[in-house]
Amino acid sequence: MENVTQKRTPGEWRELFSSQEFEEAYEYGGDDLGAVYQTQGTDFALWAPTAERAELLLYRAGSAEEGAAEPFDRTEAVRTEKGVFRVHKNGDLSGVYYTWLVTANGQKQETADPYAKAAGVNGQRSMVIDLKKAEPEGWDKDQEKLPKAPAPVVWEVHVGDFSHDPQSGVSEENRGKYKAFSEKDTCLDGNTENPTCMSWLKWLGVTHVQILPMYDYGSVDETGKKLQYNWGYDPMNYFVPEGSYATDPYHGEVRVRECREMIQALHRAGIRVIMDVVYNHMYRYENVLNNTVP
């Protein structure tokens, strides 16, 4: 088909993306996008069919504020089938942060990976993660199916709201965090007749908890320098847990492990988990999807 990397107007992009020809040429159904980690090396793959070029940048930390303003490694990606750019890097990269420098529509944009599973503080940079190391104890047994609920009772929960109050009975360091769901026998002001948090959910008898967005969203500063609140309908990284709910937002594996612990705690209580996700918009115009494929 025609050259899809040339500069276009928004209307021309819309026409191109809507065409059957583009879909047939570039639709990609593989499951290897993002950073596929192994101890001996990591494969990076980015779907960006309209990009002229893509470069992989590796960093020692998740943000410039942590002393890693410049990448320690840059690698030109190879354009392969269906507009997928690929890089293979040897060695154990677990815990290394990365971005893509994408040249598309006449502009260069440094962006996080739309397919990343972990990220540094505020989602600025993606992180290579060994998902096995981020498993809480017993996670491998969490795949067992729960009994079917005859009459579903769904309770909506905001991770921060769930335990933020000082009278919640949750330890101070875990209030408003994923780990609050793992605390047992919590009650109001020490009065066991007034259960809170997980004890309250079990007392209610709910069968499902629908969690307001717990993917990485942009309207709350994860550093915690100031008190902020949002429902979370401002997505930045769809496959990365929100860092403000983690006890450590700077190291990407922590949010993954603690989010899993939350889900595990709910399952152990016999409660299914529903994720609330919004796909019709993102936090800002300069987002990981638009920076990758304008």
Walk through the language-model features, giving the residues of each.
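Beta-propeller domains
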Residues: 61-63
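Extended, well-structured beta-strand/loop surface patches
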Residues: 59, 71-73
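Structural beta-strand segments of beta-rich domains
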Residues: 40-45
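Short proline/glycine-enriched turn/loop motifs at strand-loop junctions of beta-rich domains
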Residues: 47-54, 93
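Blade-loop segments of beta-propeller domains
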Residues: 76
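Substrate-binding/active-site clefts of carbohydrate-active enzymes
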Residues: 160-294
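Beta-strand signatures of extracellular beta-sandwich domains
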Residues: 55-57, 99
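The feature marks proteins involved in alpha-glucan
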Residues: 1-39, 67-71, 79-185
